[in-house]
Amino acid sequence: MANQKDTAETLARTPLYQLGVELKARLTSFGGWEMPVQFSGITREHEAVRNAAGMFDISHMGKFTLQGKNLISQLQGLVPSDLSRLQPGQAQYTVLLNPQGGIIDDIIVYYQGEDNTGTQQAFIIVNAATTSKDKAWILSHLDQNQVQFQDISPAKVLIAIQGPKAIGYLQPFVQQNLQPIKAFGHLEATVLGQAGFIARTGYTGEDGFEILVDPEVGVELWRSLYDAGVIPCGLGARDTLRLEAAMALYGQDIDDNTTPLEAGLGWLVHLDTKGDFIGRSVLEQQKATGVQRRLIGLQTQGRNIARHGYQVLSDGKVVGGVTSGTLSPTLGYPVALAYVPSKLAKVGQPLEVEIRGKAYPAVVVKRPFYRSSNKG
């Protein structure tokens, strides 16, 4: 997920925008869009997802369909993850890399399979603020004589329903049985009698689904889920939920100048099982010599919240910076993500964070800060 603000004059609206207005959502600008930041309150929405179910309008995110022969082998050159391992109906969270190994964006690649002519199909979801950048980058590195690329971002609604009871709320509106779908699994589905796409993915650390449908179906599905008792949630709860789960926010925790090895995303880098890809030589070097800095989890003392941009200190000297921070609604204490030198990244390492001109004690803790016992 990405972080970017724009002026009110340029803000786009999703097909579900009016539903947010009807529910008196508080709105904000995000990635070029006017989006709900909260409906009934961030804490209530956060707790609904952790304990039952909440739903999010994520239609602002970029959505691409691709098809062509040798599609997967071409995409292999853009990401460090081994996409050849994907079976039809499986997805891979990964990153687009620049030649310096920096992260252009974090994305999900959904492999839909290969037909009897050898044509492969895939669906990619990218961050809202980076949709144009990602589209240009992908197109510039694919053989467009072999691959058909379509940006379907404006044409589709994307709804996320998240939480331990998400499947029970969603199932009545879907013809197919959702239970067999594993994490990062997906399928073509019939939603409210119409064609749709459902994936068992999310950005909250809980079990849940993301549903791609036509706008009119999306409006009907949102109303149906709301009438069934699902709590509408905004970007505020989405941020506290993802931060508790230590999921990176593009533009804050990761960007063009951070590599996946620095950002704790080494599990996405499959150097031993795939060939060349953009940025590979940099990651090989980092793997061999070690990274100079690492993204860590921090817990600050009391209720002092380390916010984005705050300085991290060791022995009174600035050694790094906070990328994201909040008071965890689930845990009841402040948590943060920050970059520090690798030698200071060990769990238990005492540090300090400068908050409003004063240094407060902090300690490096394991990530994620919260791990659900309800994941599907």
Swiss-Prot record:
| Classification via Gene3D superfamilies | Aminomethyltransferase beta-barrel domains, Aminomethyltransferase fragment, Probable tRNA modification gtpase trme, domain 1
Print the keywords alphabetically: Aminotransferase, Transferase
- Look at the named UniProt entry and state the broad enzyme category this protein falls under: transferase
Any one Gene Ontology molecular-function term assigned to this protein's record = transaminase activity
Entry GO CC: cytosol; glycine cleavage complex
Q: What is its EC number?
A: 2.1.2.10
NCBIfam families for the chain:
gcvT (TIGR00528), PRK00389.1 (NF001567)
Q: How does it assemble?
A: The glycine cleavage system is composed of four proteins: P, T, L and H.
Q: State the function annotated in the UniProt record.
A: The glycine cleavage system catalyzes the degradation of glycine.
This chain belongs to the protein called Aminomethyltransferase
